[in-house]
């Protein structure tokens, strides 16, 4: 992943690293992506928002920049950083807007966007009526004496600005680590929510004792302490039997572990961050959480989500269903997903997995790398950079062997097929992006072209006007899914049973339409690529129903003592 944190700090609104969501983690493609290309995307988005705020509120550009900063929270000095950015860049932006140039011209003039020699000009908006060269020369003349131009030409990077250095470092650490940064006893569980804390895996109930963590078998039936953090401990005074023994023995407790990519982590950029007609202080209340969770929302994901869904649909995550089935499973979840993950680097993710074969309960592991093996940052010939069936076979076998050495006996592993991404273009290409809704000037076709030109597209194979390329990408995805199916049918392992499920997106679309929804409503509005919260919960419902019908043993028994557990322990300490 090529320094995805840099784009996050051009301005606090530049928390739009579309690059971090998918193929940026191809470790065997060094140097193919330049971080300043992400900075260009961020600049164009933020400058567009500033311009639209001035339009909607009939205000000056200076007032709109200050309005944007006023919306941001104080936490992580986001508001302060924003005002400092206005102080540094504001005067030049005002001068340029006075000449009626658009965001593309502003960002090229300030050199956050640069046309590489021999490369096409990358732009989000239609080109000016005058020639681009003439327009850019006029704009550069306006700011040529600006001291800030010396900074942008130095190549020092936004993070060299003193007031942003701390933010940069924190975000960089958050993205780099797949285990909690705040973990006193180093047991891979935390009492802190973000920075890979309990939003990602069950909350620790004693961060000073590494023998206490979610998912372990109870120590002495937890008569004196809650060693597995499921909220069930102590002794029933009526008969002297430990509650854990009385309520959980023989109930087949198990955890849920996801090995996934940005879709599994629930990569999400709220549309209200870019839609000025909806923008307010409330729009950015969740910004600090999003920053420290890598713009992922695992706490609301389809596999390990535990918070109430904002989508207001009745479906729950796999974890919440397992917990409802057996309340002894409380807090036993791990979302080992990462933006950009694929079969090429999944084995390294397993190093952050927490499961002790002797001390812990079995687990259900879902392998769901649904796109990055066919999605990559190459602008030319992306097909040649896709994972081949032979490579996938080798990668997945290595992963399964690693899992076999980690998982307790009685576990289960489900291989999930790749996505059917042609749906994206077919559904979105003519629709307006949130940034284009005010003036009807930015469609998803324009967004896809802009990202593709900069070589930061999450998936150039599917987010492309080239029908042949989309078909080739879908063909390779199908080949890889078939490879996963063959592995599941032919391989056996000592400590787990192995299964395969298709990524049946059409079934989810049909279910959503029965509920009165439209297909485009299942895709993340800002990036135009990821399944959104509704889609993820519908996928969870689909997976649960299929597993329950085909392999009911995977889910374990329903615990008849659930009512008693709730009566004695309430919410079991919450999440």
Swiss-Prot record:
Residues 36-117 form the Saposin B-type domain. Its cofactor is Ca(2+). The gene is AOAH. Keywords: Calcium, Cytoplasmic vesicle, Disulfide bond, Glycoprotein, Hydrolase, Lipid metabolism, Metal-binding, Secreted, Signal, Zymogen. The lineage of its organism: Eukaryota, Metazoa, Chordata, Craniata, Vertebrata. Removes the secondary (acyloxyacyl-linked) fatty acyl chains from the lipid A region of bacterial lipopolysaccharides (LPS). By breaking down LPS, terminates the host response to bacterial infection and prevents prolonged and damaging inflammatory responses. In peritoneal macrophages, seems to be important for recovery from a state of immune tolerance following infection by Gram-negative bacteria. Heterodimer of the large and small subunits; disulfide-linked. Ca(2+) 2 binds at residues 185, 187, 204, 206, 209, 212. Residues 1-25 form the signal peptide. This is Acyloxyacyl hydrolase. The record marks 344, 378 as: Interacts with lipopolysaccharide. It is found in: Secreted; Cytoplasmic vesicle. Residues 26-34 form a propeptide.
